Design a protein with these regions (language model features):
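Acidic, polar ligand-binding/catalytic clefts
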Residues: 5, 9, 13, 17-82, ...
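Bilobed "Venus flytrap"/periplasmic-binding protein-like clamshell domains
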Residues: 1-11, 44-48, 65-124, 139-143
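Loop/turn elements at helix/coil->beta-strand transitions in domains of secreted/extracellular proteins
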Residues: 14-17, 36-38, 85-87, 110-112, ...
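Short glycine/serine/threonine-biased micro-segments
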Residues: 33, 92, 166
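A ligand-binding cleft/hinge motif common to bilobed small-molecule-binding domains
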Residues: 27, 41-53, 100-107, 128-163
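Alpha-helical segments with a strong preference for the paired helices of cellulosomal dockerin domains
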Residues: 34-36, 125, 129
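A short acidic, often aromatic-flanked loop/helix-cap motif at beta-alpha or helix-coil junctions
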Residues: 28-29, 121-124, 164
Length: 172
């Protein structure tokens, strides 16, 4: 919100001229390339393929994060070393998170069931309802999502960070 207001003040001369458009991960790049939005200021990972293939400009990194996992405390899992083949994992589709999950589980030699959603609250709610063994996204997102679960203290973010996520705004 502050980044968007600052851009509006600098470019348009008025911080109140900003218009916010909620977008899913799947919609974000299309909205930017089509001109529906001018600046994509959400948790978007700057990757080589996105930098080279999409034709958009990442203007800098404003936050470094990393992907992790949240599980129920009563699952007995203390780290990703406790993961087993066949477990289900909730996450957002069309994201680096989905790709990192696939790479991570393949490297561990584990089959898993992807339970994918376009919106973070759908993934969180499905995990919270017990329909996934784990929930994965950036660790800052896990910390935030944990606070809105019915019983936050019944869930734990595992210690491993499986990726480095340079996040920042994107423009045409």
């Amino acid at each position: 919100v502050d980044v968007c207001r600052a851009v509006a003040a600098a470019v348009l001369g008025d911080a109140d001229k900003v218009k916010y458009t909620p977008l899913s991960a799947k919609e974000r790049f299309t909205a930017l390339t089509s001109g529906e939005i001018d600046v994509l200021a959400r948790n978007t990972t700057w990757t080589l393929s996105r930098d080279a293939d999409i034709g958009l400009t990442f203007v800098g990194v404003n936050f470094y994060d990393g992907q992790g996992f949240m599980v129920r405390k009563d699952s007995g899992m203390k780290s990703t070393a406790d993961f087993v083949s066949g477990m289900s994992v909730c996450t957002n589709i069309g994201t680096t998170t989905e790709l990192n999950l696939a790479d991570f589980m393949a490297a561990k030699g584990l089959d898993y069931k992807l339970v994918g959603f376009e919106k973070a609250d759908e993934a969180r709610d499905t995990y919270g309802a017990g329909r996934c063994d784990a929930y994965t996204t950036d660790k800052s997102g896990l910390a935030a999502q944990r606070t809105v679960l019915a019983n936050p203290d019944d869930h734990v973010v595992l210690p491993e960070t499986i990726s480095k996520e340079p996040l920042g705004p994107v423009v045409r």
